[in-house]
Amino acid sequence: MKMKMFPALERRYGKEHMSALEAQRLAHEISFGPIVFQVSRLMVKFGILQMLIDSKDGLTMDEVVEKTGLSNYAVKVMLEASLTIGTVLYENDKFTASKAGWFLQNDPLVRVDMDFNHDVNYLGWFNLEEALVNGTPEGLKVFGSWPTIYEGLSQLPEQVQKSWFGFDHYYSDNSFNEALEIVFNNNTKTLLDVGGNTGRFAMRCVSFNKDVNVTIMDLPQQLEMMRKQTAGKEGADRIHGHGANLLDENVPFPTDFDAIWMSQFLDCF
């Protein structure tokens, strides 16, 4: 099995570019990765990074304590950790946000990734070793006993669903405009959307082309969520469902469509 990479990636990952000290620091950062992640997440959640960004001259530790209502100890732990993480700076007894801290707070992609990893993945990662050895999603048991997460999406806690779909939609929605031009370049009238999820792409299709009929092939649970999301919207009458488990090799694949679209290509791969 070979891995193919674009030339730019080959240049970046084909040779060593770090000095020994840089490599050693990275190794230490990796060893404390979970702490780096959680402290940084809480710096955003508690509003501390935003306070530092909004403050022209920075804030003292006592001022952060006063503004957040957190204990001296809690603020001290987070600010000192953030200093070594690289998201805050310290000068003349005052803390300010670094460039990395600014992006941590303001980059929407960072927020989507952080929510996804904390709410959806974090607890399950503890079972990664079992998952790799057994070839099964062992970490999924923190939420339920389904064969894959897709059977249980509709039953996940509300915040977990929000972060899952937030991640899914952010990575896919930004590609819809270009994708629609390609899909309908050949006068497509019937489209099979494999793994259409909540029907966002299907809704864009029926809005883009007033004649197309879209059939979403997905798990029955997903189709139920799709119907709730599209109910009452213009063009929803041209969106149909075909319930099937794509992992079951015995399930026949629908035919006689002008085009077949896989939404997963926009965010999963």
Summary of predicted features, one role per range:
Residues M262-F265:
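A short beta-strand submotif of the Rossmann-like class I SAM-dependent methyltransferase core
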Residues M226-R227:
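Conserved SAM-binding loop
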Residues L9-D54, E66-K189:
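Conserved Class I S-adenosyl-L-methionine-dependent methyltransferase catalytic core
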Residues T198-K210:
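Conserved SAM-binding loop of SAM-dependent methyltransferases across substrates and taxa
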Residues G235-L247:
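Conserved SAM-binding strand-loop segment of SAM-dependent methyltransferases
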